Amino acid sequence: MKMTVDFEECLKDSPRFRAALEEVEGDVAELELKLDKLVKLCIAMIDTGKAFCAANKQFMNGIRDLAQYSSNDAVVETSLTKFSDSLQEMINFHTILFDQTQRSIKAQLQNFVKEDLRKFKDAKKQFEKVSEEKENALVKNAQVQRNKQHEVEEAANILTATRKCFRHIALDYVLQINVLQSKRRSEILKSMLSFMYAHLAFFHQGYDLFSELGPYMKDLGAQLDRLVVDAAKEKREMEQKHSTIQQKDFSSDDSKLEYNVDAANGIVMEGYLFKRASNAFKTWNRRWFSIQNNQLVYQKKFKDSPTVVVEDLRLCTVKHCEDIERRFCFEVVSPTKSCMLQADSEKLRQAWIKAVQTSIATAYREKGDESEKLDKKSSPSTGSLDSGSESKEKLLKGESALQRVQCIPGNTSCCDCGLADPRWASINLGITLCIECSGIHRSLGVHFSKVRSLTLDTWEPELLKLMCELGNDVINRVYEAKLEKMGVKKPQPGQRQEKEAYIRAKYVERKFVDKYSTLLSPSEQEKRIISKSCEDQRLSHTRVSVHTPVKSNDSGIQQCSDDGRESLPSTVSANSLYEPEGERQESSVFLDSKHLNPGLQLYRASYEKNLPKMAEALAHGADVNWANSDENQATPLIQAVLGGSLVTCEFLLQNGANVNQRDVQGRGPLHHATVLGHTGQVCLFLKRGANQHATDEEGKDPLSIAVEAANADIVTLLRLARMNEEMRESEGLYGQPGDETYQDIFRDFSQMASNNPEKLNRFQQDSQKF
């Protein structure tokens, strides 16, 4: 070890020694400053490194999130995952490097400064103190006078002791200086060497890590080159396709008009339509509609679950809507609700209507057998009230309706194609149909044919009676009168196109109806009328039914002796309440109905309760709301009321009769039914939406007439209907369709009117007593 300060000079305490000490002390002070600065920089570097590792970890988490996002791309996901794992290892290596830096630089140099330099400073303080004491002893010894021997000896002893202490401390101080100068070299070099070895280990680990990752990176680079080439190729193809599409004419937007019944994904057609909401504001909202799985559904967003508009297309129909201000509208009607839709153009509207009709037909063909296995689901007839969960005693349903309707002659086979065991019916025509023909009937629209299922739908008693009054034989005698004469053959089962053409010609164009050769003018009709005053008989005597009832079954439907046709028991009229004496009109009995105007024929047949004649009149184009100017503008529906037939009224209503059309006296069907005390008809008209607030020329509404006549049953019905109407108005559009008590009472009256009408004849019987 090379001595920085000489021990001999220390003993001499020469100026050279003092100069050497001054130089060493200055050097040590500067060394302390440098080491303190280096330690602070090391601490800052370590803190910054830790922050770098923390930020790097967040960056790695971002890469992992991106890898999870790219889970559908195996190459990207695998690459990002592998790279993030490798970089995470590098973060771990950085953490180790910073830990080793803290131990090698910060800890070692701080220990050197705190331990060795502190000892040097302590030794320096002792040396400076003893040096000062030595100087004081020398000065005191020099100042002692000769004649003071005692003081001389004392000063000499102090000086000797002080010199001895000085030499001892000075030698220790010099030793500390020399040791410090030697140790600082080793400590600094040792720290830096440890720091460099830490870096060596860091880069060696990184090299090993990336050596393993190198082949994968090389393969990925090759894949990337191929991806770049493929991307350039796809870009050229897309640019070419883009250029081709730009050259097309999109003015008609024919691409949206396509529909495919046999689509692999089950979607027949899809696209945007406007849907009218059922809220109070009737707002229109644009939604994505699709026809799939025999259902019409829509959704606002793709992630939303589709909302089902029509659960079973077989139970609905579609028609144009021209009576609203918005263009291109059409309506999908099911037994329980309707949905108003709007397309963007006329072509799109036609395409959607055709798609719905085609889907309905396809559903009939493919699911004919399955439909019979479906759960019995209630779907009230057109115009009737929502009846909720009815008991079997109050509504006829399923096999019961099927058996009763098929008992009518001709109803055991399809009316149009002859297929056996038909399970569908057209309620306004009174015929039975196979499932395929019923689909074609639905496509005609409800103004031509209203289709119901004999096994799936719920049948109210008056509707079932109507079906039993007509039948396939009766209707075919009218609509196929000229079939053999024209040489036309009925289509066979399975020939759908032939069926569709035949059914349209039969019911829409009415090509096979035997038109009347000549129709007399009104003046000629008057000449051939045999008039007699029979109004008194009509208003004061009980009118007997056309058919004589001979048997009653469990449903309350009475069979007739002549042809098995069903009819209602007769009802009597209340002559005291109807018209003042002397104001009764003369009724007309005609010689031959074929010479009558179809409207007049319907008018006459409605009073006579002759449903076959009524069907014939409608087939010849009779207006169901025809008004007889010779009899106070009375309508066929009013005549049906006067005739006392509930089934006749039901038939006219099913064929579009206006329940609120009034005669010149201001009396509608509800007025006349109330005057005559026909409780069943009052119940029927109220269910069909008759206006009970309308007043006649005398200012009387049906309720005041019933109260005046003291007809408790009709008063009950009218007041209950009025109360229910007020409840619905107070609840607004979002209220329930009717109170359960109201529905139950009306069902009871409907059952009683159809099955036990004699129970409702109390008013007539009481009036006859007087």
From Swiss-Prot:
Domain comment quoted from the record: The ANK domains are required for interaction with RAB35.
Gene: Acap2
Record GO terms (molecular function): GTPase activator activity; phosphatidylinositol-3,5-bisphosphate binding; small GTPase binding; zinc ion binding
Any Gene Ontology CC annotation: ruffle
Subunit structure: Interacts with RAB35 (GTP-bound form); the interaction is direct and probably recruits ACAP2 to membranes. Interacts with MICALL1; the interaction is indirect through RAB35.
Species in which this protein is naturally found: Rattus norvegicus
First-listed, main subcellular location of the protein, grouped into a coarse class: membrane
Domain (PH) ranges: 266-361
Name listed for the protein in its UniProt record: Arf-GAP with coiled-coil, ANK repeat and PH domain-containing protein 2
Modification type Phosphoserine: residues: 384, 387, 521, 573, 576, 767
Domain Arf-GAP: 399-520
Taxonomic placement: Eukaryota, Metazoa, Chordata, Craniata, Vertebrata
A matching Pfam family: ArfGap
InterPro entries linked: ACAP1/2/3-like, AH/BAR_dom_sf, Ankyrin_rpt, Ankyrin_rpt-contain_sf, ARFGAP/RecO, ArfGAP_dom, ArfGAP_dom_sf, BAR_dom
Spans annotated as Disordered: 371-392, 548-571
Keywords (A to Z) from UniProt: ANK repeat, Cell membrane, Coiled coil, Endosome, GTPase activation, Membrane, Metal-binding, Phosphoprotein, Repeat, Zinc, Zinc-finger
Membrane topology according to the record: Peripheral membrane protein
Record-linked SMART domains: ANK, ArfGap, PH
Membrane-traversing stretches: none
Entry-linked CDD domains: ArfGap_ACAP2, BAR_ACAP2, PH_ACAP
